[in-house]
Amino acid sequence: MPNIEELKQRQEKIRNFSIIAHIDHGKSTLADRILEKTETVSSREMQAQLLDSMDLERERGITIKLNAIELNYKAKDGETYIFHLIDTPGHVDFTYEVSRSLAACEGAILVVDAAQGIEAQTLANVYLALDNDLEILPVINKIDLPAADPERVRTEIEDVIGLDASEAVLASAKAGIGIEEILEQIVEKVPAPQGDVEAPLQALIFDSVYDAYRGVILQVRVVNGMVKTGDKIQMMSNGKTFDVTEVGIFTPKAVGRDYLATGDVGYVAASIKTVADTRVGDTVTLADNPAAEPLHGYKQMNPMVFAGLYPIESNKYNDLREALEKLQLNDASLQFEPETSQALGFGFRCGFLGLLHMDVIQERLEREFNIDLIMTAPSVVYHVNTTDGEMLEVSNPSEFPDPTRIDTIEEPYVKAQIMVPQEYVGAVMELAQRKRGDFETMEYIDDNRVNVIYQIPLAEIVFDFFDKLKSSTRGYASFDYELSEYRRSQLVKMDILLNGDKVDALSFIVHREFAYERGKLIVDKLKKIIPRQQFEVPIQAAIGQKIVARTDIKALRKNVLAKCYGGDVSRKRKLLEKQKAGKKRMKAIGSVEVPQEAFLSVLSMDEDEK
């Protein structure tokens, strides 16, 4: 066990930093190069996007989970420094992951693509880093590209973000250029962690993973004090205590250690059995010498998008619950509660941070846990003011009160920042207008790029805004949004009736202006998807009692006259009447099977079809 002096000297050598960048600006590649350069990973084990350990991350080329890795770097001054690289996601839905990892750092490397310049999400993450008082080191990456223009990007960093970019490193993570300069700048510019080894333990939980053998493993950043195997730790939010069975660091693989001291980033295993006992953002302290107060954690992220998740096989309901609990463990922002639907049976109403988050969760459930799912149309949280003066928060269309009880409805608006090349400004404005957006401001970043700011209803964004934005700007636009306010809107709930019965899972909320078109579109779409029955099935779209659109699926009929060659007309009529009576009886008791595509079709309604 080293003495206090040695620990303090070691603390001087620690550098905690993360890498922030927009998607595809080369963040994971840079992390790979840093791992190679510091010889943390042997060239035999090296693979591209090493830190993106989920298959899903590799395939989509995005970082979803954060990772924390310890590296040793021998600097030019002859000293060996301990680096903790905390890898962060770049996508707007994972901002909370970014804020968690930045809370564990003192510095951040800002990677900007030399050809593309600053993008909307780069800005969003930089502001998070500035809020956390981090030292920011700009790096202009991909300088070996033919289209690279490092000087333009340098002035952009200075003008748009206001950082001094005169010492920005020009690098190419792919070709391995400039990596050493980056490492030297980390040593010089990123401050060593503040904190006192002798103070009572305070460690911030920034992530947790579930291990079937060792229980919940916490990833922590030690802010004050130290923790070692055999200590009794206590969670400050709920006072529960556990015995530490193992502490250690990640070099991507977990490596056991005797202790973690101030400034260290590593893991603590304490045979914690239940997921609920450890909340990300909580403070760990020692039971026999607790800290006076917890560290300020993160702001609790509230889900913005809700959808119902139902297992296709109803006996998988419990498996789905267990899977969601496991995902919730290291994704504190996922919320879920049980719900039932007449059409789909038992399932869960889940809350997500955004569409990508929803997609990723759905895909992880299907892949990692082998559960086939039906997902209902995503909706947002509405504020419904009733006639008797109550305010209800409703996230599920089927929970909307009767139209006669509703006084006003408010829906969430977001402030959307869209960065786009000048020639696509028209297309972006047209799209935003069509999505009921209100124009706020527009500013030119340089001769060619424009930052357009709109207030847009979140309900329109969760629908298909991102895909539409990408296709109308040929993929050049980048987009970031944050919740701004609730506004009163003319909204109505639309029900879909099949054979006179409401299908609760197909209900959705729509603006009164688009109600007729949307209703017409859906009934036509369902007509194509729902197979023909033995009897005629009317499909109707209704607002309250009023039917706004209708179409019929024609019945399949057998030719009952085939066996009458000639014969009297009354004989034929008798057979037809008999068939008609049979169909009528069938229709009265018949129920219509709704295929899964029908639910999905409500999701994927194209504007162009409107």
Curated annotation (Swiss-Prot):
What coarse category fits the chief subcellular location reported for this protein? membrane
For molecular function, the Gene Ontology terms on record are: GTP binding; GTPase activity; ribosome binding; translation elongation factor activity
Entry's localization field: Cell membrane
Q: What is its EC number?
A: 3.6.5.n1
The chain positions of domain tr-type G read 12-194
Q: Which UniProt keywords apply?
A: Cell membrane, GTP-binding, Hydrolase, Membrane, Nucleotide-binding, Protein biosynthesis
Name the positions where GTP binds. Answer: 24-29, 141-144
User: Where does the record place a coiled coil?
Assistant: none
Q: Which GO BP terms sit in this record?
A: positive regulation of translation
Matches recorded under SMART domains: EFG_C (SM00838)
What GO CC terms are in its UniProt record?
Answer: plasma membrane
Q: What class of enzyme is it?
A: hydrolase
Record-linked InterPro entries:
EF-4 (IPR006297), EFG_III/V (IPR035647), EFG_V-like (IPR000640), EFTu-like_2 (IPR004161), G_TR_CS (IPR031157), LepA_C_sf (IPR038363), LepA_CTD (IPR013842), LepA_IV (IPR035654)
Spell out the reaction equation it catalyses.
GTP + H2O = GDP + phosphate + H(+)
Membrane topology, from the record: Peripheral membrane protein
Task: Tell me which family the UniProt entry assigns to this protein.
Answer: Belongs to the TRAFAC class translation factor GTPase superfamily. Classic translation factor GTPase family. LepA subfamily.
Q: What does this protein do?
A: Required for accurate and efficient protein synthesis under certain stress conditions. May act as a fidelity factor of the translation reaction, by catalyzing a one-codon backward translocation of tRNAs on improperly translocated ribosomes. Back-translocation proceeds from a post-translocation (POST) complex to a pre-translocation (PRE) complex, thus giving elongation factor G a second chance to translocate the tRNAs correctly. Binds to ribosomes in a GTP-dependent manner.
| Name recorded for this polypeptide | Elongation factor 4
Q: Which organism is it from?
A: Streptococcus thermophilus (strain ATCC BAA-250 / LMG 18311)
